[in-house]
Amino acid sequence: MNKILLFAIGLAIFSSCTENKKSIIAFASDNPAERVVWERIRLADPATGQIPNNIRKKEMIFAKTLPKSTVISKANWKHRGPYNVGGRTRALAMDVQDENILFAGGASGGMFRSTDGGLSWAMTTSPNQLHNVTCVAQDTRIGHEDTWYFGSGELTGSSASGGEAYYGGNGIYKSVDGGLSWDSLAVTATNTNGFDSNFDFIWNVKTDPSNDSLDVVYAAVYSAIYRSENGGNSWTKVLGGGSAYYTNVEVTSTGVVYATLSSDGTDKGIWRSLDGQNWTNITDSLFTPVYGRIAIGVNPGDEDEVYFLAAETDGYGQHTDVFFNGETWTSLWKYNANTTAWNDISLNIPANQNSSFDNFNAQ
């Protein structure tokens, strides 16, 4: 009897260990990269190995031809989500004509417009357009306020393609009806699924409010700065062209242009131009030698005072501990255009708070 009991106990222990081992194997860590490859194989044309161009638009057109069921009534259904498909909000703007009209663009969710100060929102990008908005700008000149531009293409990862994977765009979109509808600027769009144009990834777009004779627009794209004099119908590269991953551009009310290119590019640094075509590198000799994206802020009360916030400045600037046991370095500098003087004010960046979630973490 004792032998039978011991055998039963041993069998139970062995079974328990086996089950635990199976559980560990069953819940192995995910691999987002393999998921992307798997999904691409499922979507690609077997003959070419590529995802057909404009296939989503064709799919939507075909769906309209399918027979509709009369059994299920719309009254039987209630929308239960998901509601959080906008992704990271990369673009935000207020209409200069009406402060209650707001625009918000998601890195993987499209462009949304509000007419009541943000109490309610309506998507203004159409289903057959790419929904990866990264920046938005209004033409603030008198008589041109209904003209808007937004750039597409997310290089730092989005919910549509995985946390570390980029989400390619399709150029710049333009609206001439106050943001109610958007049309692609054909010269910036390739309508392909691959990375084959600088305009596939746009960091920022700005208009020149000082020029009444030309419709001047600037675009900070992958590795370069482009300029248009006809509202985006044609473009000229005015700065860069190397391998800078991050770029940015800002324009003052008088038409002075500032641009930045990350340290991995050949034309790296902080640049200034009086006409948008001839540029001077104004980077201070003590500025951090390593930097990624640089945000630009012009003081509206004194446009000769410009701030530059640089991320990923390893070993320089302010060190902060961030969530998930991470750490980061960020540098903040102030430039005076009158005196050409630079001040390192990185110590003003919040750090060493009670929680790592309270520390500053640039994107």
Question: What residues fall within each predicted segment?
Answer:
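Extracellular glycan-interacting surfaces
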Residues: C17-Q363
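Sec-dependent N-terminal signal peptides
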Residues: I4-I13
